[in-house]
Each structure stands twice: as C-alpha cells, then as structure tokens.
C-alpha cells in the first residue's frame, strides 16, 4: 500500500482508481480470507474508488463483458490475483522461489494447452510454498522447494471442484518441472474442493 500510495502521488490529473472487485471478494472478506481489494486502501487517498462489477459473480461479469462486445480472450481469461504472483509464492518472496513459480506455471500452461485442457479448466496455476522438502538427486540428498499444481472448475467462484486431469498430463508436467526448474524436488497436485479450501492458497 505504501508503494502504491507513493506512485499514486506522482501522477497528475488522475481522479479515479478502478478495481476489479467481484462479489465473492466481498463475501469472503467477511470472515473467510483477506482480499487486497476489499478495505485495504488508505483512507486519505485522493482517488475516488470505482468498482463497477463489485456486486456481480464471475459468471455474471462474463455475461456483461460479452454484452459489451469485449474480446473473448479478455472475457474468458483466467482470474489473476491483484497482488500478482506474491499470492502464489507463499511466505517471504525470494528470487529463487519466484523464478520456480514462473517457470513451473509456464510448464503447466504449456502442457494444459497441448492436452486441450486450457479451455476446459476454469483456472489453473502453480504454487510454491515457503518450506523445503527432502529429495534425492544424482544419488545425493536434495533439500528443495515443492511445486503445487492447483486446477479448479467453477461457475461463480463461490464453490469449486477439482477436475480429473489425465495421469499422462500430470506425469508430463511433473517430469518437466523436476528436470527444467532449478531448486524443485517435488510436485504435488492439490485435490481440495471449495469449500473446504479456497481457490487461491492465500
């Protein structure tokens, strides 16, 4: 917030701040989890907050987008957290874990695309937690990061199910992550529906 406030003060002639807050963000912020875009802005900001879709669910936002004639690539794109990859790089954000997150996520997207899953799965991404796991590489102990694959299907983002991803696709992702991403020694697949888990880990 401090950096945002500093950068905002450098701008001239800007009166509004637009945010993509949707209704599930508001509902979940009341006792489930904190959302960056719900009640997190300083009161003394000189912007008027504009949240045009804050009372709509994700599927309703897409209906509005299509009605407005927005490109399909924009209307159907996957949600991405406002704080960026920091939400998926759990704990202290370090260069090595952020690199592992970017590289593993790129592999996941490429393999889902090749398998025809990119259009069938509502949202998918990888997570790198802030703990290490023991592994074995070249006959020696490895103490590296795990990568967690998260994939969900939903309509309104209030509930979500975990799709059945073909084993061959999961094996291909795992093999590539373990051979192509430095500092990773384990790949996990998150099978948790919402509820009990939320879509994002944080």
Model-derived features with residue positions:
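ATP/NTP-dependent adenylation/nucleotidyl-transfer catalytic domains that generate, transfer
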Residues: 1-202
């Amino acid at each position: 917030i401090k950096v945002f406030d500093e950068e905002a003060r450098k701008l001239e002639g800007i009166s509004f701040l637009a945010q993509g807050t949707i209704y599930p963000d508001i509902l979940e912020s009341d006792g489930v989890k904190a959302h960056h875009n719900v009640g997190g802005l300083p009161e003394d900001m000189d912007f008027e907050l504009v949240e045009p879709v804050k009372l709509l669910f994700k599927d309703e936002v897409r209906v509005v987008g299509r009605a407005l004639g927005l490109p399909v690539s924009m209307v159907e794109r996957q949600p991405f957290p406002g704080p960026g990859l920091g939400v998926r790089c759990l704990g202290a954000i370090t260069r090595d874990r952020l690199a592992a997150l970017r590289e593993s996520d790129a592999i996941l997207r490429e393999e889902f695309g090749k398998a025809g899953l990119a259009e069938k799965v509502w949202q998918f991404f990888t997570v790198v937690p802030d703990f290490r796991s023991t592994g074995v590489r070249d006959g020696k102990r490895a103490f590296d990061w795990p990568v967690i694959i998260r994939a969900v299907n939903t309509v309104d983002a209030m509930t979500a199910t975990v799709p059945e991803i073909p084993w061959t696709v999961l094996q291909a992702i795992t093999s590539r992550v373990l051979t192509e991403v430095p500092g990773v020694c384990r790949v996990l697949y998150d099978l948790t529906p919402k509820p009990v888990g939320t879509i994002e880990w944080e």
